[in-house]
Amino acid sequence: LVICGKGGMIDELKAQVNAMGIGEKVYFAGYMAGKDVQRMYKAADISVFPSTYEPFGIVALEAMLSENPIVVSDIGGLNEIVQHKENGMKTYCGNPNSIADAILELLYDHKLCAEITKKAKNKVRNEYNWSKISQDTHFAYQKAICQSMAEKQKRELEQERAKKTKKAKNTEKEITNLLDF
């Protein structure tokens, strides 16, 4: 097992590994970048991201693009990106048995693993490329601008309607005063 990355939990993980007596089977690679990350994805059988909080998950997209099957927690952004047994495997957040089951299924079901890997790579290529991202960003700005303009026009119409209503009430009051005269 290779654990990549750094963070506040690394010392606790190392202590757990040592306490379990599996230190010789677990390698802590630390932070990796660039070509090292690509080599790691190519060497790995599966990439597992058991996050308890993940707003988006760039590393999972990198693994998918590298044709590395992924196992993710069913939370955050990855929950929206990954469809279970379509382009990855979802597990119950914080449930080690769920993670183990997903890993074993990928290791033993080569057909499923190949299908997931292919679909995952296609999803990343089609939905997370710079052209698509720029189009989506442009659309979001257009939508926000149009919404803002529509809200401004609505406010202006409401103000105009209020002025006309006030003027009509004043005119009605003047007519009533003239008739009372």
Task: Spell out what each predicted region is.
Residues 52:
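Aromatic "clamp/platform" in nucleotide-sugar-dependent glycosyltransferases that forms part
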Residues 12-32:
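Nucleotide-activated donor-binding/catalytic signature segment of Leloir-type glycosyltransferases, i.e.
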Residues 130-181:
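C-terminal alpha-helical cap of glycosyltransferases
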Residues 84-85, 89-96, 105-110:
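Conserved acidic donor-binding segment of nucleotide-sugar-dependent glycosyltransferases
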Residues 69-72, 82:
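Short hydrophobic beta-strand element within catalytic cores of glycosyltransferases
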